[in-house]
Amino acid sequence: MVASAPASAGTKGVIRQVIGPVLDVEFPAGKLPKIYNALRIEGKNPAGDDVALTAEVQQLLGDHRVRAVAMSGTDGLVRGMEAVDTGAPISVPVGEGTLGRIFNVLGEPVDEQGPVNTTATAPIHRDAPNITELETKPKVFETGIKVIDLLAPYRQGGKVGLFGGAGVGKTVLIQELINNIAKEHGGVSVFGGVGERTREGNDLYEEFKESGVINADDLSKSKVALCYGQMNEPPGARMRVGLSALTMAEHFRDVNKQDVLLFVDNIFRFVQAGSEVSALLGRMPSAVGYQPTLGTDVGALQERVASTVEGSITSIQAVYVPADDLTDPAPATTFAHLDATTVLNRALASKGIYPAVDPLDSTSTMLQPAVVGDEHYRTARAVQSTLQRYKELQDIIAILGLDELSEDDRRTVDRARKVEKFLSQPFFVAEIFTGMPGKYVKLEETIAGFNQILAGELDSLPEAAFYLVGNIEEVKAKAEKIAAETK
């Protein structure tokens, strides 16, 4: 889908060279398209095959030629075919009509649900918000998830890195965040699937429908728009699909004045696609073979994710770390932009602690007294020091048993185990698996609950009472129920 075009639109050029997804197109003198303009190629090749694709101008070569990168396969494309300058960048549909739908990089619906119910479109290339428009006062974004709100709080309009292997609960955590922002903040979400498996994209769509995040019967009640450029697609599509998703999110922020969640899975694949395109365009590679423009490519995307005085885009980005090397230029460049990291731990998942967020490895720049307040800061640090001490004592416990510990250490272990259990929480989107109603816990309730555990006020309650509950009052009610059952 391409926006209404200016006067330069409609200029016709001729394809002079095709190398994989890269094409060189010759235009009449003085009629060259601008960088990032979309070129449309439609027609039949000499073999009689239908060809239809969009390409994006990347370089001006001289001799009235431009070099463009195709957004879909170039099979059947031949020299001499006609390319038309649309006069504008690739543009995607925006607004309420995008909710519940799946789009490709060009904003075309790919879910077989018919045309999109919106006439508004927006170009995927835009400047980041002006510094005068930004909300400069840091504000905590409450998620209703205890472990995140207490130990690694998200910044409204900030960027969060989500680290975790397969099967530790990334998708369920993403679904819960989408559900909570819709219910508590009245906001919507946009999901950008960048260079990941098609099967995962399909599974996510089906899970969204099951959990009610997408309402298949009435799409207008859906809470998320999906934008996919999967790993079987050309690098041009994978490089630009993140911008397509971001453009949809910007409309909800700037026009609807909403708080928006933007999920990008996976931000590394965005860099990887940029690296492939850079090599195809003949640029000299830099460190580890990445593109020389790595910093500006990542910055152009990340700087548009911001909180303005009108609304905010809070971005949660899954980060793949190649060969677990955090010094690799791709994750290292991404880290510079992140405000918080949420690390999912397989050991916690195997214990049945869900969400399996690691309370010691997850970090946030928001966790400082000037932002969250003294009480929140003190409680979070006390929880972390208690869990750290428990971690240090585990070797001794494994070898000698609990009885060999001092009275103080035994008390610490007892409270740490209760804290660990209390960090678990039933999710709304997991109700269909667990049979437990989901819980949204306010930040003040979370802080009060952990303070009571650490102060020893709940030492007499059984550990089981702290597992998979919402606030501390539910712990007390569950303890009474357990006591009644054991009589």
Curated annotation (Swiss-Prot):
InterPro entries: AAA+_ATPase, ATP-synt_VA_C, ATP_synth_F1_bsu, ATPase_a/bsu_AS, ATPase_alpha/beta_chains, ATPase_F1/V1/A1_a/bsu_N, ATPase_F1/V1/A1_a/bsu_N_sf, ATPase_F1/V1/A1_a/bsu_nucl-bd. Its EC number is 7.1.2.2. The keyword Ion transport applies. Gene3D superfamilies: 2.40.10.170, Bovine Mitochondrial F1-atpase, Atp Synthase Beta Chain, Chain D, domain 3, P-loop containing nucleotide triphosphate hydrolases. It catalyses: ATP + H2O + 4 H(+)(in) = ADP + phosphate + 5 H(+)(out). The keyword Methyltransferase does not apply. It is an enzyme of class 7 (translocase). It comes from the Bacteria. Its main location: membrane. Keywords: ATP synthesis, ATP-binding, CF(1), Hydrogen ion transport, Ion transport, Membrane, Nucleotide-binding, Thylakoid, Translocase, Transport. Pfam families: ATP-synt_ab, ATP-synt_ab_N, ATP-synt_VA_C. F-type ATPases have 2 components, CF(1) - the catalytic core - and CF(0) - the membrane proton channel. CF(1) has five subunits: alpha(3), beta(3), gamma(1), delta(1), epsilon(1). CF(0) has four main subunits: a(1), b(1), b'(1) and c(9-12). Produces ATP from ADP in the presence of a proton gradient across the membrane. The catalytic sites are hosted primarily by the beta subunits. This is ATP synthase subunit beta. It comes from Synechococcus sp. (strain CC9605).
